[in-house]
Every structure is written in C-alpha cells, then in structure tokens.
A protein has these predicted regions:
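Catalytic cores of nucleotide-enabled group-transfer and carboxylate-activating enzymes in metabolic
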Residues: 1, 169-182, 191-212, 219-222, ...
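Positively charged, amphipathic and often flexible ligand-engagement surfaces
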Residues: 1-99, 107, 752-760
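Intrinsic disorder at enzyme termini
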Residues: 54-162, 593-616
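N-terminal alpha-helical segment of soluble enzymes
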Residues: 143-224, 228, 410, 414, ...
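Short, well-ordered beta-strand elements within core beta-sheets of diverse protein domains
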Residues: 164-171, 185-192, 377-379, 408-414, ...
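Extended, hydrophobic alpha-helical segments in both membrane/secreted and soluble proteins
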Residues: 201-202, 216-220, 224, 228-231, ...
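Conserved small-residue-rich beta-alpha loop and adjacent elements
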Residues: 251-320, 385, 606, 653-720
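ALDH superfamily catalytic-core signature
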Residues: 311-316, 338-339, 344, 351-491, ...
Length: 819
C-alpha cells in the first residue's frame, strides 16, 4: 500500500536489495545490518511504520514531526538550498576557481575577519583544502567529457617546451651557466619583496591553478596517461600547495630568537608520475621562502609542467624568478643539478637518483622524497570487505605508479587462509577496467613507458615458492597497458619483499601474529607509507607505537595524501637530506637558514620557564659557561619548551574532519617522534653552543652520541653517567676533527648535528669525505636560541590518518584512541 501511494504521487519507485549467490550471503550481511540499524533508529519514520495504525503515541510523534517540518519550510525564505551545487562548467565560464576561494574573495583572506593571525596560528586560521570535482553533478560529467575529447589532440605546453629546450654539448653547458647566473640574481630581488607581497602572489597562483584545472587535467591525460579520477585531485593538491605555503611562509617571521634568510636559487627536479602537484609543490615552497627557482621537468611530462609554470607566470610570478629549463639528460643536465651556485635541490624520485646526484656534487643541499616499498597489514579483526577495497585502490591507482602505492599485503593469522578474502580480492582485481586514460570508464590506465627491466620481471617472473593469484597480462602491443597482477607466497628478504617496482603488481605475505607482520613491514630499506586494517584498538595502538614510516593509515587507503591533512614524507631511505614533510608546517623552513637575533643579556640566574629536564642539564653545564653563554643557553631552553608546548609535543589534528557536524569522522594527526643523532662540536666551537644543542636534544627526548673537540664540563659528564638524565647520551667522545671524520666513515650515522665556526665549510668537507652518502643527513646551521629551529634535527615527523567511523556512525574505540 505504501509503495502504491508513493508511486501514484511521484510516478516512479525504485526498489533495491543486495543480490548474492547463497554461498556469498555473508557479503550482504553488513549492508543489511546497516539498513536495519538505520531504519530502526527513532529518528527514522520507518521505525514506527508498523505501529502507526495501532499506537496513538507513534502516530502523534510522526504527525508532530511532519507538521514541524512543514512549518520550518514555510518559515524559511525559500526551499532548502542544495549543498552539492558545484559546477565546473559555470566556473569555467566565469573564468575562475570556485566561488569563495582565496582567489575570489581576496588573496590572503582570513576566516577570522581580517587582520594579523594570532601567534603560532600558522595556516590554521586561513586555509581550506580545494574541493575535488563532484562527478555526481551532470555539469561536471559534461565538463569531464569535454576534457577527454580535447586531450586527444591537445598540444598545450608544447610551445614553452620548444622555447626552453637546451641543446647538448658545450653550448648547452654555457646556456646553463647563463640561466643560473640570471636566476640567482633575480632571487635576490624576489627575497627583498615583502612577505605580504609574496603571499599575495602565491594566493593568486592558487586561484590561477584553479581556473586552469581543465587545462592541467587535459595535458596530464594526454601526456602522462592520468585518468580523470587521478588527474583531478592532483590539481587540487597543487592549488592547496599555493594557498598553504602562502600562509605558512608568514610563520618564518614569527620564530623567536632567529632571523630567516632564504637561499637565492633552488632547482626543482619533479617526477613524471605527479607532473603538476609535486612540481608545483617544490616551486611554490621555494617561492614562498623567497628563493628563485629553476624547474627541470621530467622528460616524460614536460608539457604538464609547462602548463603549470605558465599558470604561475600569469598569476604574477616573475618570469626571471621562475625559469623553465628543458635540459637534456646528459652533461648539460648534470651541469644544472651539480652547479655550485645551486643552494637547494628538490627531488622526488628513486633513492638511486639521489645517490647519483650526490655523486656529481657530494655537498648538494638536497631535499628529496624518494622510494617506497609500502605494505598494508590486514588482521582477523579487520572488516574484510573494506580492507580489500582499500588494498586494491592503493595498489592499482595510476597503475601502481605512485611512490606511496601498496605493493605488499601482509595477512595475519586466519586472513592468510581465508577463502572469502581471497575471493573478494580476486573479484576486485579482475573487475578493474584497464584502458586508455582518454576513456572516462578507465580505472587503471597505462604505464608511462613500456614495461622493462625490473618492472617487466615483476610482471612476468615468479620467485621460488611464489604463484599467481591473478596473473598480469599485456593488453596491447605497446607494452604500456597491463592488467593488474597479484602474486602469492612472497617471503621475508626476497626481492619482491624489499624492491620498489612502480607498476600494477601486488605481493601477498603471511604472518602468524601482528608482531611478526610488523617485522615484515619494517624490514624494507624504506619507510614512506604504511597501512593497517583492524578494528581492534589494542592492535591499532600497538601498531602505531612500532611502525617505521612517515605516513600511517588505519582502516583506509594509503595513497592520496592531502596538503596539511596528511603532510607527506618518509623515513629511512624514503627521504634524503634534512627535509621535512611537504604540505606540512615546517617545509618552507628548509629553503633558507637561520641566524641568531641579537639579544640583551638578562642580568639574572633565574631559570623560570625552563623545563625540569633542561634545568638539570643547564645547571650541570654552568661551570663551563661564561655568563653570556649561560644566558643564551637559558633563552634557548625557554624557547625549546615553548616550541614543545606549541608544536612538537602535541599530536594535533588541524583538519578536524566532521567537527562541524559534531563528530570527527577521520582523524588526521601530525606528531613528532625522537630520533638518534650524532652531535659534533668541531674544533674552536664554543662550549655554550654545544650545550644549547644538547638541551634541544634533551627536550626532544632523542638519543645522542656526543663528539666534541673539547672536553665537556665534568659536572655534565657526571650527570650523563647517572643514566637517568633527560639528556640521553649513548656515548661521549673527545676527539679531533680528523678523528671524528675517520670514525664517521666507519659508523655513518643517519643524522649529524654539526657545530662549527663555519658550519657550511665543515659540512661540505664531511660530505666530500663521505662521497655524498645520501644515507647521512647533516644539519650545520648556525646555532640559535630558537626551539622551533633547533629541535627539528632530533625529531621525525609522522602523519597519522585514521578512519574514526563505521559506515557514517562514530566508532569510539578508534575515535578516542590516544595518538
């Protein structure tokens, strides 16, 4: 009767129900339970539908709700406005990004009504992520179809590529010399512009990238084989970088006790797999800091980078400050990468590429995001259906050509023998639509180049004990189109366990326990992304405490990091140099150096504002310090505590997804973890600078190995020897510079904080002695009292993204888990 009544009124009624084979009935259970739970809720009229004619109370409840809804509608100025109103066609016709973006409401707009941001607010008060395209809207689907049609014949960016080509040989090297000299000179003028002016230009750049979303997706589809679903969020990321760095650069002027000076010249060498977002990220961060930029695009995606650069030029970035140079991959490219006038080199690519660049110039100041061998652990307490969906999406998006892609699944306990898991995985993988990026229905697009070398081996050759659960197949004669593959039986230490392949192939490993699975996950040389699927809060907590990666994901996919929400960057060989996370609060700091602010000495011995741990170290060091040095160290200890309270000692979720509706649905937390560092005080280094750096290490809780050319104060050594000091010194060695260098060649510590009268020269000599070893990162900046600066070498950033709901309903077990 109800169905007939609805049909008579609206003319059409759709009835739907899950249809499954009897043996797969459990696959429908979760859906049916969600519907039952939803319909049984007292907020839903269906909960009383069978009692309306029998219960006056239920009838009156529903009558009251109905009349109240009519009254609310009549009181409103009009019909309720739809929330989903995005129209890329309308935006395109208007010639701008979405209404309300920073580009439309005025660059540098503040959500707090204007004026200066509060201290330590950073970008938290004035930044919102760009919205990806809502493909449920008819206008947007029409917009997408027009992009794919244009992509068939597009030549966007080609004119700039042709005009920027550098020839090979001596003439090309000479051209590089001219470009470097001219751009470096322009960098000085760019740095001289005010922070407000540079910020306005970057906000305008974000608006221009938004306006050219279609152009950027078009050229990426044509040149890089990116589907609409992959290209659209990449443009959003580029837009986010512009607005985020436009605001985070302001923090550089608010750091206490230190003055920031940008480097003059940065070279950006982006990858082909994210030719717009990652290229834009490096360029925009350098520009935000005040550095001029030369971008050398990846040979496979020159036009995509060119269209991005043209958008930045058209938004107000001076052409002499941002240079597009298409240098060949020979001695000319080497002349640019290894040029002594290059102050920063931003690289995203293989660890081996970073090693190659360091072999050309051992001291090249590299900020690199490198390789990943990423795994998702799935435990028996996981939601198997969701785990499979996230695993497949993470493994085969962009044909697996992401450094963050899941190339391993580690199945714990009964999951490893689960017929249901295997059946779901095979079904999900074999039903992925593989094809051209110019086909709107394609899910897995082509490889950037024909499969060759180690990738071809991964797609065609099994190791001993392995077999194909789903065997990959070449689908055309080009060698670029492959159906996804899944290999079983991958064992610890095998090539597939530890090697990055960068293609559509997934390996399956088995573990008896979560602890064993973690050992497998942590056993690779890399630490970029890592995932866990488990609904058990104890398992999640244990995993979060022990996993070794920069970006962690719980009960969701492990790709698609979003600016600010999940700042991106890895541990171990997934990162080279002293870099911090892209899209995070410290990234722009890497494009310059800090010098101490001239301070007035406090005529007091008071230690107010100094933490208890720092107090004991400072008091033990006091006999070896002049009063000026003591005062500088004390100021540093106070600043350390402030930085700890504001940034490093808190696990903060700036995005607060769902908070406006009363429930956090996804927790995105940036936290900091202490890491081991070798602290070296070179010959003629002041004792107070060593003590100041050790105080930063103590506040961070980092384990340190101390090497000093002069003996430490006896009282400080005595404190260290107790083993209960906040200064966690594993060793203390007094030695010459020559002896330290010789010992470093043997030990090769991952991080060195180098204190020397000429830190740059000392670091250069050490890098050369190490032959540019990319596994060793050296911090050699002038020692300051700024805790926001000095704590960074002793901490590793870690971004945690955790799904805090179950099908839209809050899941307190994970929503309230301490992070």
């Amino acid at each position: 009767d109800q169905a007939d009544a609805v049909r008579r009124t609206v003319g059409h009624l759709l009835l739907y129900t899950p249809v499954v084979h009897p043996s797969d009935f459990d696959s429908a259970i979760s859906y049916l339970i969600r519907r039952l739970e939803e319909n049984a809720s007292t907020e839903n009229f269906l909960s009383g539908v069978f009692e309306l004619t029998r219960s006056p109370h239920i009838f009156e409840r529903e009558e009251l709700r109905f009349r109240e809804s009519l009254a609310a509608f009549e009181a409103a100025p009009g019909a309720p406005v739809a929330h989903r109103v995005q129209s890329r066609l309308a935006e395109q016709a208007f010639g701008s990004g979405p209404a309300g973006s920073a580009a439309d409401v005025g660059v540098g707009a503040r959500v707090d009504g204007g004026g200066e941001l509060p201290e330590h607010a950073g970008v938290r008060a004035g930044f919102d992520n760009a919205a990806d395209t809502d493909t449920a809207m008819p206008d947007n689907r029409e917009w997408g179809r027009s992009i794919l049609k244009s992509a068939q014949t597009t030549t966007r960016g080609q004119a700039l590529v042709d005009a920027s080509a550098v020839e090979s040989g001596a003439a090309g090297v000479a051209a590089i010399e001219r470009v470097v000299a001219e751009t470096r000179l322009a960098g000085a003028a760019w740095a001289a512009r005010s922070v407000d002016e540079r910020s306005r230009i970057l906000h305008a750049a974000g608006g221009m990238l938004s306006a050219r979303r279609a152009d950027l997706i078009e050229v990426m589809a044509a040149e890089a084989g990116k589907t609409l679903a992959e290209g659209d969020p990449e443009v959003s990321e580029a837009i986010d970088f512009a607005h985020y760095y436009a605001e985070s650069m302001r923090e550089l002027t608010r750091i206490d006790h230190a003055i920031f000076t940008p480097v003059q010249l940065t070279v950006v060498a982006p990858p082909w797999n994210f030719p717009v977002a990652i290229a834009a990220g490096g360029v925009l961060a350098a520009l935000a800091a005040g550095s001029a930029v030369i971008i050398k695009p990846a040979p496979q995606t020159r036009r995509s980078a060119a269209v991005m650069v043209e958008a930045l030029w058209d938004s107000g970035v001076p052409r002499e400050v941002l240079r597009f140079v298409d240098a060949p991959e020979n001695e000319v490219g080497r002349a640019l990468i290894a040029h002594p006038a290059v102050d920063r080199l931003v690289l995203t690519g293989a660890w081996e590429t970073a090693a190659l660049f360091r072999s050309w110039r051992p001291d090249v100041p590299i900020l690199a995001e490198t390789s990943g061998k990423n795994a998702i652990i799935i435990t028996p307490s996981a939601d198997i259906d969701l785990a499979v969906a996230d695993l497949v999406r993470s493994a085969f998006g962009h044909a697996g050509q992401k450094c963050s892609a899941a190339s391993l699944a580690i199945l714990v306990g009964s999951v490893a023998t689960s017929a249901r898991f295997e059946r779901q995985l095979v079904d999900a993988v074999t039903t992925l639509r593989v094809g051209s990026a110019l086909d709107a229905t394609t899910v897995v697009g082509p490889l950037i180049e024909p499969a060759a070398g180690k990738l071809l081996g991964a797609l065609t050759v099994l190791e001993e004990g392995e077999d194909w659960l789903v065997e990959p197949q070449p689908l055309d004669a080009t060698g670029t189109l492959w159906s996804p593959g899944v290999r079983r039986g991958v064992v610890a230490g095998s090539a597939f366990h530890t090697t990055e392949y960068f293609g559509p192939v997934l390996g399956i490993m088995r573990a008896r326990t979560l602890e064993e699975a973690l050992e497998l996950q942590n056993a690779t040389p890399f630490g970029l992304t890592a995932g866990l699927h488990s609904l058990d809060p104890d398992e999640v907590g244990y995993w979060l405490d022990h996993v070794e990666a920069g970006n962690l994901y719980v009960n969701r996919g492990i790709t698609g990091a979003i600016v600010r929400r999940q700042p991106f960057g890895g541990w171990k060989r997934s990162s080279v140099g002293g870099s911090t996370k892209a899209g995070g609060p410290s990234y722009v700091m890497g494009f310059g150096s800090f010098t101490p602010v001239v301070r007035t000495v406090r005529e007091s011995l008071s230690l107010r504002g100094v933490s208890d741990g720092a107090r004991e170290v400072l008091e033990a060091s006091q006999p070896g310090l002049e009063f000026d040095g003591f005062d500088a160290v004390r100021a540093g200890a106070v600043s350390d505590q402030r930085a700890w309270d504001d940034e490093f000692g808190v696990a903060r979720d700036d995005s607060q997804l769902g908070a406006e509706f009363g429930e956090i649905v996804e927790r995105n937390v940036l936290r900091y973890r202490p890491t081991a560092v070798t602290v070296r005080a070179a010959e003629r280094a002041p004792t107070y600078e060593l003590v100041r750096v050790l105080l930063a290490a103590a506040r961070a809780g980092a384990r340190v190995d101390i090497s000093s050319a002069i003996p430490l104060p006896a009282s400080l050594l005595a404190l260290i020897s107790t083993g209960i000091s906040s200064l966690r010194a594993a060793s203390v060695v007094t030695e010459t510079d020559a002896r330290f260098t010789a010992r470093t060649l043997e030990v090769r510590p991952a991080r060195i904080r180098l204190i020397a009268p000429d830190g740059a020269a000392a670091a250069r000599a050490l890098h050369e002695a190490l032959d540019g070893d990319p596994d060793v990162a050296i911090w050699s900046g002038v020692v300051t009292a700024a805790g926001r600066v000095e704590l960074l070498p002793f901490l590793r950033e870690q971004a945690v993204s955790l799904t805090a709901h179950r099908f839209g309903n809050p899941y307190p077990a994970l929503a309230e888990l301490a992070l």
